[in-house]
């Protein structure tokens, strides 16, 4: 076409399925990202530690704080404002009761299934929850999300947990609030965990806090 850039056969890159009537999103990741960022912005921590969450979201957090990112697969690229540490969610390289702002979003359901090169561990989510709880400081907050609904294992992709399971796994923490992306993709803030118990594949977002030490 006149005025167009040069075109060669080996530069062709056909995209045939983008002519949709509405924009396509993954509601779990879009809504949990906005939810998590708002929670962190309200607290405005000097440093935030994330374990294995969606990397573009982790990079976005550098707009408001310094971030330590822990993952079993270290980053190959440097991201300004992000310090990367290689680590296993079942054995975090952190001292007990040391972290004041912590997140682990849509991660724990994969632990122990071998999908990412880790060993098999049937109690993967439960042990991950125990480790996250171990490192959370008094007065600290944990943002945690997993697929919720009727509990089952979808090997080797992920697990789906009942909200009650997650509350039991974090029994030594206080649930501050719970939000939900339901099976229709609708975000439902400040919901009751019981509302998700019969879901097929919802996203449960739990904000936990460890009680502050008595003065």
For the regions a language model picked out, list residue spans one by one:
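A short glycine-rich, Lys/Arg-flanked "PGG" loop and its adjoining helix->strand segment in the class I
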Residues: 120-141
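Conserved N-terminal segment of class I S-adenosyl-L-methionine
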Residues: 1-91, 97, 105, 212-215
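Conserved catalytic-core motifs of eukaryotic protein kinase domains, centered on the activation segment
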Residues: 113-118
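Short conserved AdoMet
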Residues: 62, 137, 171
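Acceptor-substrate binding/catalytic loop of class I
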Residues: 122-123, 144, 149-168
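A conserved beta-strand element that flanks and buttresses the S-adenosyl-L-methionine
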Residues: 103, 108, 112
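Class I S-adenosyl-L-methionine
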Residues: 163-213
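Short amphipathic alpha-helices and their capping/turn segments at secondary-structure boundaries
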Residues: 89-101, 129-135
């Amino acid at each position: 076409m006149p005025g167009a850039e040069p075109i060669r056969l080996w530069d062709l890159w056909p995209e045939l399925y983008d002519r949709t009537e509405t924009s396509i999103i993954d509601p779990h990741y879009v809504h949990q990202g906005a939810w998590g960022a708002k929670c962190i912005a309200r607290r405005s921590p000097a440093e935030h530690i994330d374990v294995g969450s969606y990397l573009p979201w982790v990079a976005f957090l550098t707009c408001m704080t310094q971030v330590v990112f822990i993952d079993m697969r270290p980053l190959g690229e440097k991201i300004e404002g992000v310090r990367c540490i290689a680590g296993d969610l079942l054995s975090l390289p952190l001292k007990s009761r040391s972290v004041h702002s912590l997140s682990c979003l849509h991660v724990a359901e994969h632990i122990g299934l071998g999908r990412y090169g880790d060993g098999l561990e049937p109690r993967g989510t439960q042990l991950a929850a125990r480790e996250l709880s171990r490192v959370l400081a008094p007065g600290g907050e944990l943002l945690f999300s997993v697929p919720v609904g009727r509990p089952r294992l979808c090997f080797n992709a992920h697990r789906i947990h009942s909200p009650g399971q997650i509350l039991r796994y974090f029994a030594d923490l206080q649930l501050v609030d719970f939000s939900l992306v339901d099976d229709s993709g609708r975000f439902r803030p400040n919901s009751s965990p019981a509302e998700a118990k019969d879901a097929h594949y919802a996203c449960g977002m739990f904000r936990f806090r460890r009680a502050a030490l008595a003065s």
